[in-house]
């Protein structure tokens, strides 16, 4: 959500395939409801549209198995094309259909959390994709990148260093940027408060973006996929 909103333009589309939660689609619904209740948000959305002359990026619901099919159907119906589509997929390969969807991606970015269960699951997921899809060259995938999410700043350097060594030994690739564990990532638009950080309609408030790790992550992801860093002021 933050990646798409931070780099929002008409080249982006968000596809919410995290069945059954569909958390991104639900967030868009909350955003729209809160805009209708908050005059400041209405003005902000209007000024944003006047400035960039583009609507908010679309969000559609889908199942992991049907994500690519639904994307093409959407583009055919709307007569639109997109340079970038962000898929919000569950971190599991539950069925053959999910594997086909994952194989159709260009890049996969896997968030990591320094928890043994989460790490074992994430690394196993990534290793399977590397060995069964990328290494065999029978898919569209160009690469998989891991990145640290919810990093504890209170001092667990030894733990992160140990996991980094494991990742290196497994031959997996880790982004240098990371996202700290901070409450600002929970700050959505609401009817009474200002200073939005997480939203499907607005980019993060610049005052809260400092030390969030988000600009660095966006820049590194853009470099990885061969995209010039977006103008986040648009």
Model-predicted segments: where are they?
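Inter-motif core of Ras-like GTPase G domains
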Residues: 97-116
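Conserved C-terminal guanine-recognition region of P-loop GTPase G domains, centered on the G4
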Residues: 125-135
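Single conserved hydrophobic/aromatic residue that forms the stacking wall/gate
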Residues: 1-12
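Switch II (G3) loop of P-loop NTPases
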Residues: 78-98
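NTP-binding/hydrolysis catalytic cores, primarily Walker-type P-loop NTPases
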Residues: 196-234
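Beta-strand-loop-alpha "switch" segments that mediate conformational coupling across diverse proteins
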Residues: 150-199
């Amino acid at each position: 959500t933050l990646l798409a909103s931070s780099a929002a333009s008409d080249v982006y589309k968000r596809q919410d395939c995290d069945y059954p939660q569909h958390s991104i689609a639900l967030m868009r619904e909350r955003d729209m409801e809160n805009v209708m209740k908050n005059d400041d948000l209405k003005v902000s959305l209007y000024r944003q549209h006047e400035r960039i002359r583009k609507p908010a990026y679309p969000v559609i619901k889908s199942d992991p198995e049907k994500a690519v099919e639904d994307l093409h159907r959407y583009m055919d119906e709307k007569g639109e094309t997109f340079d970038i589509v962000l898929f919000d997929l569950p971190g599991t390969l539950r069925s053959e259909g999910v594997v086909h969807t994952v194989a159709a991606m260009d890049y996969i970015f896997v968030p990591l959390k320094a928890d043994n269960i989460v790490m074992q699951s994430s690394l196993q997921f990534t290793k399977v994709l590397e060995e069964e899809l990328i290494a065999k060259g029978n898919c569209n995938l160009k690469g998989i990148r891991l990145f640290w999410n919810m990093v504890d700043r209170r001092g667990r350097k030894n733990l992160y260093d140990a996991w980094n060594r494991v990742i290196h030994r497994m031959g997996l690739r880790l982004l240098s940027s990371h996202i700290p564990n901070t409450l600002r990532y929970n700050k959505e638009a609401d009817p009474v408060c200002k200073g939005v950080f997480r939203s499907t309609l607005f980019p993060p408030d610049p005052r809260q973006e400092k030390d969030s790790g988000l600009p660095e992550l966006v820049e590194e992801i853009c470099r990885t996929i061969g995209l010039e860093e977006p103008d986040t002021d648009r």
